[in-house]
UniProtKB/Swiss-Prot annotation:
Gene3D superfamilies, sorted: Succinylarginine dihydrolase (3.75.10.20)
Broad enzyme group: hydrolase
Name recorded for this polypeptide: N-succinylarginine dihydrolase
EC assignment: 3.5.3.23
Function statement: Catalyzes the hydrolysis of N(2)-succinylarginine into N(2)-succinylornithine, ammonia and CO(2).
Family according to the record: Belongs to the succinylarginine dihydrolase family.
Binding of substrate, residues: 19-28, 110, 137-138, 216, 254, 366
Organism: Legionella pneumophila (strain Paris)
GN (gene name): astB
Keywords for the protein's UniProt record, in alphabetical order: Arginine metabolism, Hydrolase
Subunit text: Homodimer.
Length: 448
């Protein structure tokens, strides 16, 4: 039976803007209050989907969440009509209004953690939507992400959905951005590598903590997901992220490492006690594991964060053994990083034999590269057929979506534009049409 890695990219929403809401995300902070271009952001994302689809990969999308989040505004004390809520929030707490308008659901690597059926005891694909409690603007995504995934993967013969982990600091969960799966191929059972930044309960005196920026993922959350997903404990590793890397802007592990099948591309300063982590991987691997460790002399952690090299997608084309690195254009523009990539491609000791650079500037300026924009869902033929087909990409659907973006998206969005009630109605009109395009039914709160 065939097995695939379905890339589910987040479709960028109309309220994409730069507000600097994410502590520890250096790009987000550095570009705060600058002017965004939501139309360009969405079209760059669609072009990424088109490129991967035309390479022969299975490609889907997750739609934007409803914004502004009027219910969150209400919870925060802003009452009245939608226009009154927006006006009051803008005048007294514009940063809260910005959070309620956030389009951060575009980074679907944080939407959930997904386990392949070949790895689970009940042979079903398991999903746990991330609670994302570390940031206000992201925590609001959790319930709707769960609802979306339950709709798209609704057949209980193949798919198992778990409740969100408790919304507490002890079980803070950031989704697949802190999870890697290593295997001989997508069809084979794999090693699940969960990465955490802190342990909250019990004795954790032997592990360090970041000082400058907060660690988001807890070990307790990762362990709970592994248990709920019925993963074989002998095939699971829990690794602590290097706190020094977190303090340099590595807020998720997918900013400092990337895995695909039997290849693990990782910076030498990614993990606390890295030699032990890599030894565990080698010990558990019953396949020819290829670890490509990039030294700090080749690329510093700071340079990795600036260019998002490790937030590239590493992909295997159908019926091929070689791999392609899908990297942000910022890597090509940095001579040191490009030289490193050229060396990887030229090295016959690893399967990476080409690189493709993507322009994702709008997302990158908010701290999201190619890997941030996609949730990996491992599926076999039966599972792929059993899911909702309306969100699966082909060129015809991409053409329709491109016209939809041109119709509804602004080419410029400033923080002051969030005070315009008309933006709310533009968003609702667009989402109403989108649900028809993707055959999602009345899935948004305003449609019920």
């Amino acid at each position: 039976m065939n097995a695939y890695e379905l890339n589910m990219d987040g479709l960028v929403g109309q309220t994409h803007h730069y507000a600097g809401l994410s502590s520890g995300n250096i790009a987000s902070t550095n570009n705060a209050l600058s002017i965004s271009n939501p139309q360009a952001a969405a079209r760059q994302g669609l072009e990424k989907m088109r490129q991967l689809y035309n390479m022969g990969l299975k490609q889907g999308l997750l739609p934007p969440h409803q914004r502004p989040n009027l219910n969150l505004l209400y919870q925060l004390g802003f009452k009245g009509s939608p226009s009154e809520q927006i006006n009051k929030a803008y005048k007294t707490a514009p940063e809260l209004l910005s959070a309620c308008y956030s389009a951060s659901s575009m980074w679907t690597a944080n939407a959930a953690t997904v386990s392949a059926s070949v790895d689970t005891e009940d042979n079903k694909v398991h999903f746990t939507a991330a609670n994302l409690i570390s940031n206000l603007h992201r925590h609001q995504e959790a319930d709707f992400s769960k609802k979306l995934l339950e709709f798209i993967f609704s057949n209980s013969d193949y798919f198992n959905h778990h409740p969100l982990l408790p919304k507490s600091m002890g079980t803070s969960d950031e989704g697949a951005a802190n999870h890697n799966r290593l295997c001989q191929s997508h069809a084979h059972s794999g090693i699940n590598l969960f990465v955490y930044g802190k342990k909250v309960l019990g004795n954790h005196q032997f592990e360090q903590s970041p000082i400058k920026y907060p660690a988001r993922q807890t070990k307790e959350a990762s362990e709970a997901i592994a248990r709920n997903h019925l993963l074989n404990p002998e095939r699971v590793i829990f690794a602590c992220q290097n706190p020094l890397a977190i303090d340099q802007g590595v807020f998720h592990n997918d900013v400092i490492s990337v895995a695909n099948e039997h290849v693990f591309l990782v910076h030498e300063e990614a993990f606390y006690n890295q030699a032990y982590v890599l030894d565990q991987l080698k010990e558990k691997a019953d396949f020819p594991l290829v670890i490509i460790q990039i030294s700090k002399e080749q690329i510093s952690v700071s340079e990795a964060v600036d260019t998002y090299l490790f937030n590239s997608q590493l992909i295997t084309l159908p019926d091929q053994k070689n791999m392609i690195l899908i990297a942000p254009a910022e890597c090509q523009a940095n001579l040191k990083v490009k030289t490193c990539i050229d060396g990887l491609v030229a090295d016959s000791q690893n399967p990476i034999n080409s690189v493709y650079y993507l322009d994702l500037k709008q997302s990158m300026r908010n701290g999201g590269g190619p890997a941030c924009l996609r949730l990996r869902v491992p599926l076999n033929d039966y599972e792929l057929k059993a899911m909702h087909q309306g969100i699966l990409i082909d060129n015809d659907l991409l053409d329709i979506l491109d016209k939809w973006v041109l119709k509804y998206y602004r080419t410029e969005l400033k923080i002051s534009d969030l005070a315009d009630p008309q933006l709310l109605y533009e968003c609702l009109d667009a989402l109403d049409e989108l649900t028809q395009i993707l055959k999602l039914g009345s899935i948004y709160p305003f449609q019920s």
